[in-house]
Amino acid sequence: MAKSIIIQAPALCFLSLLGFAYSESRFFVEGKVYCDNCRTQFVTKLSTYMKGAKVSLECRNREGGTLIYSSDSETDKSGTYRIPVDGDHEEEICEIALKKSSDPDCSEVSKDPFLKKSARISLTKNNGISTPVRLANPLGFMKKKPLPECAKALRELGMNPDDVIQ
């Protein structure tokens, strides 16, 4: 009896781990959308998070850029979105992009060719991240005109407002 337990226990552990390793992957992409009240294209103390903004997740083939997976989401009252994603997308480039603003006065997306307009995320178990949650960088829409208090807020950060505000 004792010998059979000694043999069965490691076998059971091994089979459990094997099943876990080959289980279907499920990820959750989380991020925030903000209104860039200072047109700096980064979060400041004057930025506000946007309820009802729409974002899109797209995973494309690395070779030809063919769309493999797509999902849309909307932010909650804290400006946060959460997109469930089934499957491992190790061989694809996955990015979150702004789709639609919930505020007509804060709906501009930068046209600067040097700026990234999306947040790239890794949706695979083979990257050393142990949790299924993937955090994307914050994405922001810009206000049409910066708030008057932006210059002071930027000086507090040690920045020259004329160099930063677009």
UniProtKB/Swiss-Prot annotation:
Record-level GO cellular component terms: extracellular space
Tagged with keyword Transmembrane helix: no
Residues spanning the signal sequence: 1-23
Pfam family, one: Pollen_Ole_e_1
Domain of life: Eukaryota
Keywords: Disulfide bond, Secreted, Signal
Keyword Kinase: no
Subcellular location per the Swiss-Prot or TrEMBL entry: Secreted
PROSITE patterns documented for this protein: OLEEI
Disulfide bonds, paired cysteine numbers: C35-C106, C38-C150, C59-C94
Stated family: Belongs to the Ole e I family.
Cross-referenced PANTHER family: F28N24.16 PROTEIN (PTHR31614:SF2), PROTEIN DOWNSTREAM OF FLC-RELATED (PTHR31614)
Protein name as annotated: Olee1-like protein
Origin species: Betula pendula (European white birch)
Source organism phylogeny: Eukaryota, Viridiplantae, Streptophyta, Embryophyta, Tracheophyta
